[in-house]
A protein has these predicted regions:
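Gly/Ser/Thr-rich active-site loops/lids in small-molecule metabolic enzymes
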Residues: 135-180
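Catalytic core of DAGKc-family lipid kinases
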Residues: 61-141
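ATP/NTP phosphate-donor binding region
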Residues: 1-29, 33, 70-85, 96-106
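ATP/nucleoside-binding phosphotransfer catalytic cores, i.e., glycine-rich phosphate-binding loops
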Residues: 114, 130-133, 182-285
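Short glycine-rich anion-binding loops that position phosphate/pyrophosphate groups of nucleotides
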Residues: 35-38, 61, 148-150
């Protein structure tokens, strides 16, 4: 916005100018001003070009952002002095096949979601892992996510929060019409498949990061696997992921009885450290 541009020009003495994509891809770092949606859009441009992204949150939660708008001065100084570290976040390769023929190929940083395109009917799907059918059910959709995406759409659908250091793929059914359908976490070398059955009658739609769409006719198959091209993010002050969760989601760390005192917390830690490990001995007959 104009206020950010003015801040860069007047207070920091940085000239702002529109440049082409070729110029952006030649830089050592890309600064993103916005929320998580802006990060996902920027990742479209820089993925595969080794350009890390550093985001300043101008939105709401800004889970992928590294700093807030009030820290813009400090952020620019850190960039100028290259006082940051670069981490890699796993991405997904997404392939759509119809009758065995590839009709679309795309990718996702957060998630690929298979959804119904009409509210009147459910999707009928079969979920498979490494070409082995696992379960079939009717649903509003299926979210296939990365650990990065575990705090986004998959989280809203009841999926687990997965630490970014864990390499895994998530499968989270949305409003499944089944008794025992639960979210799945599979290994990073696996391929998750979702087949849209002909009994669905209506088309579905594939959404990747809420941005890229592909229409899914009955008999379409979606295959998701780990991508060889991660997305690189810059971090100014790497903090434990648990702290980021608490700060971004404003999680309550106090029980209903009130704040936990430092003395109580120290007592719990001391008790954990002094517990002797139990060794399994022979079982009695």
């Amino acid at each position: 916005g104009e206020d950010v541009e003015q801040h860069l020009r007047v207070r920091l003495g940085i000239d702002v100018a529109a440049v082409g994509l070729e110029h952006l891809l030649a830089q050592r770092l890309g600064l993103v001003l916005g929320g998580d949606g802006s990060v996902l859009r920027a990742a479209d441009f820089v993925r595969g070009h080794n350009v890390p992204l550093l985001a300043v949150n101008l939105g709401h939660v800004g889970f992928l952002a590294e700093s807030e708008r009030t820290d813009l001065h400090r952020t620019v100084q850190a960039i100028a002095s290259e006082s940051y570290v670069v981490i890699e976040r796993m991405a997904l390769d997404v392939v759509v096949l119809v009758e065995g023929r590839e009709v679309a190929r795309t990718w996702a940083l957060n998630e690929a979601s298979v959804e119904k395109s009409h509210r009147e009917r459910m999707l009928e799907v079969v979920v498979s892992v490494d070409n082995s059918p696992l379960t079939a059910f009717g649903c509003d959709g299926v979210v296939l996510a990365t650990p990065t995406g575990s705090t986004a759409y998959a989280f809203s659908g009841g999926g687990p929060v997965v630490w970014p250091s864990v390499e895994a793929l998530l499968c989270v059914p949305i409003s499944a019409h089944a008794l025992f359908t639960r979210p799945l976490v599979v290994g990073p070398r696996s391929t998750i498949g979702v087949d849209v059955l002909t009994r669905t009658r209506e088309t579905g739609v594939l959404w990747c990061d809420g941005r890229r769409t592909v229409e899914l006719p009955p008999q379409a198959r979606i295959e998701v696997s780990r991508s060889a091209e991660p997305v690189r993010l810059a971090r100014l002050n790497p903090t434990p992921f648990a702290e980021r969760l608490v700060r971004k989601f404003r999680l309550p760390t106090d029980g209903w009885r009130g704040p936990v005192t430092a003395q109580e917390r120290a007592g719990v830690l001391h008790a954990v450290e002094t517990v002797e490990p139990r060794h399994a001995g022979p079982r009695p007959d």
